[in-house]
Structures are given as structure tokens and as C-alpha cells.
């Protein structure tokens, strides 16, 4: 009985502590000489940032350094384990001249964190757990404490990347957690974002998931044009990763509008980048619609 009461008391204390946890956070910088952005994430941060250098170049913005630390499917908790173990499991990409370069395929979390005095560091949960708040509640303060300890700039803004719900036909192993229901997953992600913003002092959110969901209600969605057995469905290329055309473009526009407009004063609206340097070019009309979806999403999360 005594052991039970001690265990119960410890659990209550842990719950009470998590309820009180907040993080020290700072605003986005205003018109810095060089803006430095690091994404600590997984394949969904890859999807979100892949076309950001192209948008920056088209906007005439050449004073932004963007980098991403990538492990496929990496959770908040795993980032913390990677740090504790000092393992070199990350691929580290960096853009200093609006073009991605692979810096290392065997990087540690510290390699990325200490590479630059980052102004903005983005974090996110793995898509599997993106709508399960207990995983965010445990992982966010742990990872942020590591960032605060190791990042050269003690006033870096910590920004949350909101990811997207799977396509309705997705066969992702985690989709049953959400009843194989896209709207249920989307609502769960939104709820997690809202709670995390309040609990952990995360005012700035990159709402890629919101922008993608908005776009799914437009002609950009292909769910009425291809059979539901198609892998390329509802702006995904496999049921969960974004298509290399409109999907990734929408997400990059969302990153741009969230981070570049408030810091450097340039909106993504009217950006002329049409992916002509890739195999996935889009029309100016479609680009404009993607940009509008991104802007609408960002306004909803201001």
C-alpha cells in the first residue's frame, strides 16, 4: 500500500510539473543582416522547406541561411535520445546561396545546432504522433532545453511546424490511430497545436497542415480526378508525404509567409517561382492559388 501511495504521489507530481512547464521564447528578429533558420525534423520538414530557397531567390532575398537536420520519421523523443547518445544519424542539408547542399550524411544534432547562431529553430512531431498530445507534452520541453543549452544564440525563436493529415486513402501504419479518418487526424493536429502554443509559449506556428487542408478544398486536389487507389492522392505522393509539385510548393509558401514576411517584409503573394528548375513545374495560376492557401493559413494562426 505504501509503495502504491508513493507511486501515485510521484505520478501526480509529474502531471503537475508538466502542467506548469513553459519555455523561454523570443520574438522573430526584425530585418537582420542575415536571417538564419534551422529546421530540426524529419521528412515532413524536408517536404516543407525543399522549395524555400527557390522562393527566396525569386523574391530577390539572398541574405537567408536555411538548414535542416533530417532523420526519417524522427519523433521529438528520438531527437532527445540522439543528443544524449551523441549518434550521427542525421542528414544535414544547408542553403546559403538559395541552393541546397548536403553538408553531411552522418551528422549529430550538435553539428547542426552549433553550425550557426540560428535566429529561428523550428521543431515538430513525427506525423504518427502529431495528433497525440501526450507525446508533444513530454517531448517539447525536453528538446527545447537541449536547444537552449547548446545553440550559440540564446535568444533564438523556437517555432512549431504544424504538419498535415494523411490522404483519405493512406495506408500509413499510424493512420488507424485516427480511425483512418483524415478530418479526425486534422482536428487532432489542430488541437495539439492550440494546446502546445498556450502551454509552452510557442506563439509562432508554421501552419503547413492548415494550408494543405485548405488546398484540399480547391481545384488543386485531385481526389475527383484519379481513382482512390492512386498513391498520388490529395496532394500526397504516397498517402502522407507531399507531392513534389503543388504539395511541397504550398508548404514552402507557408514557411515563407510565416518566417520571411515578418522578418524581412516580403510576402509570398505574387512570387514568380514556378519550379522551372525542377521536373515539377507549375503554372502561374496554380502558383497563385497555392500562395493564397498559404497566406490564408498563416492569417488563421497569427
Language-model features, listed with the residues they occupy:
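Residue-level detector of flexible, active-site-proximal loop/helix-junction positions
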Residues: 44, 70-73, 165, 212
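Structured segments of extracytoplasmic/periplasmic soluble domains
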Residues: 47, 54-62, 72, 124, ...
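Alpha-helical cap/lid subdomain in secreted, periplasmic
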Residues: 106-245, 257
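Conserved catalytic region of serine esterases and O-acyltransferases that act on ester linkages
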Residues: 228-302
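Conserved SGNH/GDSL esterase-like catalytic core that processes O-acyl groups on lipids
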Residues: 46-139
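N-terminal secretory targeting modules
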Residues: 2-68, 270-302
Amino acid at each position: 500500500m505504501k509503495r502504491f501511495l508513493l507511486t501515485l504521489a510521484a505520478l501526480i507530481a509529474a502531471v503537475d510539473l508538466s502542467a506548469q512547464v513553459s519555455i523561454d521564447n523570443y520574438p522573430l528578429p526584425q530585418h537582420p543582416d542575415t536571417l538564419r533558420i534551422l529546421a530540426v525534423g524529419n521528412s515532413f520538414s524536408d517536404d516543407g522547406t525543399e522549395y524555400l530557397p527557390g522562393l527566396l531567390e525569386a523574391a530577390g532575398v539572398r541574405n537567408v541561411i536555411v538548414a535542416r537536420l533530417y532523420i526519417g520519421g524522427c519523433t521529438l523523443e528520438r531527437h532527445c535520445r540522439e543528443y544524449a547518445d551523441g549518434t550521427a544519424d542525421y542528414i544535414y542539408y544547408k542553403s546559403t546561396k538559395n541552393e541546397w547542399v548536403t553538408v553531411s550524411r552522418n551528422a549529430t544534432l550538435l553539428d547542426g545546432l552549433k553550425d550557426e547562431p540560428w535566429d529561428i529553430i523550428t521543431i515538430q512531431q513525427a506525423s504518427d504522433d502529431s495528433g497525440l498530445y501526450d507525446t508533444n507534452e513530454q517531448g517539447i520541453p525536453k528538446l527545447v532545453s537541449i536547444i537552449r543549452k547548446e545553440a550559440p544564440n540564446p535568444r533564438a525563436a523556437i517555432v512549431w511546424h504544424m504538419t498535415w493529415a494523411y490522404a483519405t486513402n493512406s495506408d500509413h501504419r499510424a493512420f488507424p490511430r485516427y480511425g483512418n479518418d483524415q478530418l479526425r487526424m486534422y482536428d487532432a493536429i489542430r488541437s495539439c497545436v492550440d494546446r502546445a502554443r498556450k502551454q509552452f509559449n510557442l506563439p509562432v506556428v508554421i501552419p503547413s497542415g492548415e494550408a494543405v487542408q485548405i488546398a484540399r478544398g480547391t481545384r488543386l486536389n485531385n481526389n475527383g480526378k484519379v481513382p482512390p487507389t492512386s498513391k498520388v492522392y490529395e496532394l500526397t505522393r504516397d498517402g502522407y508525404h507531399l507531392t513534389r509539385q503543388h504539395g511541397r510548393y504550398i508548404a514552402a509558401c507557408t514557411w515563407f509567409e510565416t518566417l520571411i514576411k515578418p522578418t524581412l517584409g516580403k510576402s509570398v503573394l505574387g512570387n514568380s517561382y514556378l519550379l522551372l528548375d525542377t521536373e515539377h513545374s507549375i503554372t502561374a495560376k496554380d502558383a497563385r492559388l497555392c500562395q493564397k492557401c498559404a497566406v490564408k493559413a498563416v492569417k488563421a494562426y497569427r
